[in-house]
Amino acid sequence: MTHYTKRAFLAAATCACCASAVGRSFAATSPASVGAFGGEGLPTLLELGTDPMTRIGETVWVARIAPQLWLHSTTASIQGGYVFPANGLIVERPKGSLLIDTGYSPDQSELLLQWSNINLAAPISSAIATHFHRDRTGGIDSLRAHRIRTLASPLTCALAKEHDLPVPDPIRNFGEAPHRLGPDCEIFFPGAGHTRDNIVAWLPKHQILFGGCFLKSVTSDDLGNVADADIPDWAASVRRARAQYPLAKMTIPGHGSIAGDPVAQTLALLAKSNEQN
């Protein structure tokens, strides 16, 4: 197995990249450390969200991180051939589970749907995208083929269309106030940061905040892809999210490890960036 340094991965990272081909094989492995899989092009342990994760396809992993809550990590090859994982969630619900972010490609979303059909009492029946980049919206066409809507803010829909990316369905009456998507999920626009449209998802039952690419993992040593970022406003937006959800027991970033404090790490990286500029 080829291992790349964390710095090399992050220097090459881009959320808007195109996905590599995803294998159709659905033979799930037993939970194991990533290193146990071997082979070229696989991410190292530090780059997936957690350990262990179950590999359900060539570029798709899942792990239960709380009762009725699953982390999914999907990977894509980006410039230089580096493999970069993206985190998302599956929230189990009695009448149909919720997918938070689709992965990079339709094939990856298809694998997540197949897995949910087999492993969850109520398969995925709805989805949300936390911003317009491909690692959040790339699987929309697969979901739509199954008559599953992917909701997003009106700004996310507009930006996806502008950048010729899969376009979600707009959430009605979405504004500055937190917006409930049922009793177990709330979404909130804290302000511009990684992108102008990034939102966070709050899971009150678990007291978990999903920050998406708006927040950086503790293993990140820079801000990653900032092509669409609003760096001057980013720190204030992070503080706004922290103030909105002060009871968060876990905060999940869009890429990398879900351990530690991504809020503090993001603020530190922003301070470092400001010092350098």
Predicted regions span which residues?
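Metallo-beta-lactamase
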Residues: 57-59, 64, 96-97, 104-105, 146, 151-193, 197-265, ...
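Short Pro/Gly-enriched beta-strand edge/turn motifs at strand-loop
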Residues: 42-44, 67-77, 157-160, 181-185
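Short, electropositive alpha-helical surface patch
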Residues: 262-277
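N-terminal secretory signal peptides and thylakoid transit peptides that target proteins
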Residues: 1-20
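Active-site metal-binding motif and surrounding structural segment of the metallo-beta-lactamase
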Residues: 95-97, 107-151, 246
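C-terminal segment of N-terminal export signals and the immediately downstream linker at the start
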Residues: 23-64
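Conserved beta-strand hairpin/beta-sheet module of binuclear metal-dependent hydrolase folds
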Residues: 63-114, 200-211
